[in-house]
């Protein structure tokens, strides 16, 4: 899951980034709304953590800008303002939730999970594709009752595929979603990680779930939907 932090307090920004990455999130961070708009031109985020009082462009103006362009990325306002009117103003500006500083990090994690569940139309922390289950809260993957151990990047890629079930994701989309804004790595890294994920989730006597669409990217589907055509492969 890819998050964008927009917070002008450098210490808090760094602490949030560190803790969120430790909990398995991909994170980009910036310090004002104008900079954030530039990030959003090249990366799609699952959720945004947004301060209100910032230089150059504050949180309210940033919210107005993205909502007027019909961007519905979930936004959590993170601010020291705790009056009822401040909360109402923030929510009316287009925020999905509001958390007052200081706060417990566990509450922030829970609110992020709730926001993203709503955005993806989920009613629980579990995502299912056939008999493969991914628990967003526990960062746990199970297939046919057997727990599967994934690296952090393998988990992030699988989560992204499962949240976009039946939709083809390009290698560039996967890279932008899982790695930091300025990442530059091996050109075949996505292919290598997908191959590793397949080896781990395709248990003995189980049918494959992740397919390659030649020239396009990858897609995850229920086994009964995997009537492959000449453009599909699982290698």
Feature names for model-found ranges:
Residues 1-119, 235:
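N-terminal/domain-start alpha-helical segments
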Residues 2, 26, 74, 124-126, ...:
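Residues at or immediately flanking beta-strands
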Residues 2, 113-168, 172, 222-223, ...:
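Short, Lys/Arg-enriched segments at the junction into DNA-binding effector domains
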Residues 29, 55, 86, 90, ...:
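Short glycine- and Lys/Arg-enriched binding-loop motifs that mark or flank ligand-binding interfaces
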Residues 35, 215-219:
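Glycine-rich nucleotide-binding loop
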Residues 68, 93, 120, 163, ...:
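Short, conserved catalytic or interaction motifs in soluble domains
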Residues 140-209, 214-216:
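Positively charged, aromatic-enriched patches within helix-turn-helix-type DNA-binding elements
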